[in-house]
């Protein structure tokens, strides 16, 4: 499983946003 695709960046961004909203 390689994370060398734009999906990795998108998933990371989505995860950060989700955590930010969840921590609100």
From Swiss-Prot:
Cross-link (Pyrroloquinoline quinone (Glu-Tyr)): 16-20
GO aspect biological process, one term: pyrroloquinoline quinone biosynthetic process
This protein's pathway: Cofactor biosynthesis; pyrroloquinoline quinone biosynthesis
Pfam families, sorted: PqqA (PF08042)
Organism: Methylococcus capsulatus (strain ATCC 33009 / NCIMB 11132 / Bath)
Similarity-based family: Belongs to the PqqA family.
Keyword entries, A-Z: PQQ biosynthesis
Top-rank lineage group of the source organism: Bacteria
Function: Required for coenzyme pyrroloquinoline quinone (PQQ) biosynthesis. PQQ is probably formed by cross-linking a specific glutamate to a specific tyrosine residue and excising these residues from the peptide.
Protein name, UniProt field: Coenzyme PQQ synthesis protein A
Coiled coil spans: none
């Amino acid at each position: 499983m390689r994370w060398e695709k734009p999906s990795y960046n998108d998933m990371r961004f989505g995860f950060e946003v989700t955590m930010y909203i969840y921590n609100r």
